[in-house]
């Protein structure tokens, strides 16, 4: 049996055991070590891959699933008209090259992102900025590059900084007051900020007409989530995806921009382009996504305008998954949420006591990557899991730690 087949069998077995909910503790040290080694060989990285120095100073970098300062607290039930929760209790990320020759994905995490982005901007300009009270919002993003990694890496460096600038400008301009009108205005401001951010970053990385042809053929999808105490804002451009688990139900927060999506096909054709079925539906027979950052040579058919979803948080919100199509091409929303939920609720911790992080968001992300590999994903695979409230009780955690 080949090593690839053996690896897929081990991953599939692990996933089946978690789905079955088998809580019996066996002698698993060897298999656990083997799974860890397999992930390392595949090039596993955790949320520390967000290499921005400012972000590292703001958030813990010692654990791939770094808990926030509120991670030891159970998210409170809403007690007022405008409910507030911790932005997140933990987050984790895994990004692997998979069966591709080159790594073109990039991920970024900054929590809280406004403070991290402010520090990065001040360092870049050399100008000191007054301290201000920023809302505790986390920034999470997956960028799936194509034609090379240049644009995805540029998005990782710039997207959160530009978005923070756009958000601050609109908050400075907003008026006082309260009520439904203000809430609606705030939603509109978030959509405007996201749209302006994507346009600016696209302008920075898209390449000019006189630029080298190679630079014009590089692009990246982008799915970005800003998680705050009151709401979740998701902006998507391309076929990466964001899915929320709410009360055990998978709720998509984005819609893939595929060339054969009826409204996207109509838009492309109205701009003078064509959607050709050449090894799958593609813009001009070339690109399998109808929106992206970069890809100057395919404009105006391929645009960088994101679709933005602004959703109020509830006490049923459990976790958020952001991932590239390396996961979504082989795993459905429902299955992904079931796997992550079982992991975060403690089933994986009792089954795999030597797990690197102990049934945290990073473990959930790693298990989803294993599942995608076992199902034959041929792409880079990047997964970010954001835990919004504790699914595992303190009693369960104490028993496991004292075992």
UniProtKB/Swiss-Prot annotation:
<dbReference type="Pfam" id="PF00481">
    <property type="entry name" value="PP2C"/>
</dbReference>
<feature type="binding site">
    <location>
        <position position="325"/>
    </location>
    <ligand>
        <name>Mn(2+) 2</name>
    </ligand>
</feature>
<dbReference type="InterPro" id="IPR001932">
    <property type="entry name" value="PPM-type_phosphatase-like_dom"/>
</dbReference>
<comment type="similarity">
    <text>Belongs to the PP2C family.</text>
</comment>
<dbReference type="InterPro" id="IPR000222">
    <property type="entry name" value="PP2C_BS"/>
</dbReference>
<keyword id="KW-0464">Manganese</keyword>
<feature type="binding site">
    <location>
        <position position="144"/>
    </location>
    <ligand>
        <name>Mn(2+) 2</name>
    </ligand>
</feature>
<dbReference type="GO" id="GO:0046872">
    <property type="term" value="F:metal ion binding"/>
</dbReference>
<dbReference type="InterPro" id="IPR015655">
    <property type="entry name" value="PP2C"/>
</dbReference>
<dbReference type="GO" id="GO:0004722">
    <property type="term" value="F:protein serine/threonine phosphatase activity"/>
</dbReference>
<dbReference type="GO" id="GO:1902531">
    <property type="term" value="P:regulation of intracellular signal transduction"/>
</dbReference>
<dbReference type="InterPro" id="IPR036457">
    <property type="entry name" value="PPM-type-like_dom_sf"/>
</dbReference>
<keyword id="KW-0479">Metal-binding</keyword>
<keyword id="KW-0378">Hydrolase</keyword>
<keyword id="KW-0460">Magnesium</keyword>
<feature type="region of interest" description="Disordered">
    <location>
        <begin position="42"/>
        <end position="80"/>
    </location>
</feature>
<feature type="domain" description="PPM-type phosphatase">
    <location>
        <begin position="90"/>
        <end position="388"/>
    </location>
</feature>
<protein>
    <recommendedName>
        <fullName>Probable protein phosphatase 2C 8</fullName>
        <ecNumber>3.1.3.16</ecNumber>
    </recommendedName>
</protein>
<feature type="compositionally biased region" description="Low complexity">
    <location>
        <begin position="62"/>
        <end position="71"/>
    </location>
</feature>
<feature type="binding site">
    <location>
        <position position="379"/>
    </location>
    <ligand>
        <name>Mn(2+) 2</name>
    </ligand>
</feature>
<feature type="binding site">
    <location>
        <position position="144"/>
    </location>
    <ligand>
        <name>Mn(2+) 1</name>
    </ligand>
</feature>
<feature type="binding site">
    <location>
        <position position="145"/>
    </location>
    <ligand>
        <name>Mn(2+) 1</name>
    </ligand>
</feature>
<keyword id="KW-0904">Protein phosphatase</keyword>
